[in-house]
């Protein structure tokens, strides 16, 4: 919605759609003040949980979200319900998991103290190999890629 190519002071926004029974925001990644990361952003997730095959939101549906730090000072797996908000102050986060039958939407809001706006991230090295297996894969047609100018795929 609001990538680094658009005008803003420090805010970045992105939307993610995760079909029911699937994962997103994986491999776990971070955008914090760590030596290997080029940016320092805090991130807030705003979740909506739907009902498969409808445009309705679900009071009963749920998902999961994981956040952790290498030193173990943060290590949480939280159950997400429709309308929940989760703040990631630092550390690796992901995956977000949508329960079968309950597609998940989330709005990511990022901001940080740096002068340059960037959505850059660093994968958890333990799981980075997973990203390398995606080369050549077609995007999932249930998750359309769009910009402010419309659908790109």
Language-model regions: role of each:
Residues 47-82:
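A short beta-strand-loop-beta hairpin characteristic of the jelly-roll/cupin
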Residues 1-3, 100, 107-153:
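Double-stranded beta-helix
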Residues 42, 75, 101-106:
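Short edge beta-strand segments in beta-sheet-rich domains
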Residues 79-101:
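Conserved metal-binding segment of the jelly-roll/cupin
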Residues 51-54, 70-73, 92-95, 101-102, ...:
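Short Gly/Pro-enriched loop/turn and capping motifs at secondary-structure junctions
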Residues 1-44:
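A short glycine-rich, His/Asp/Glu-containing loop-to-beta-strand
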Residues 11-13, 75, 85:
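Intrinsic-disorder/low-complexity, polar/charged segments enriched in Ser/Thr/Lys/Arg/Asp/Glu/Gln
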Residues 62, 85, 103-105:
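Beta-sheet entry/capping signal
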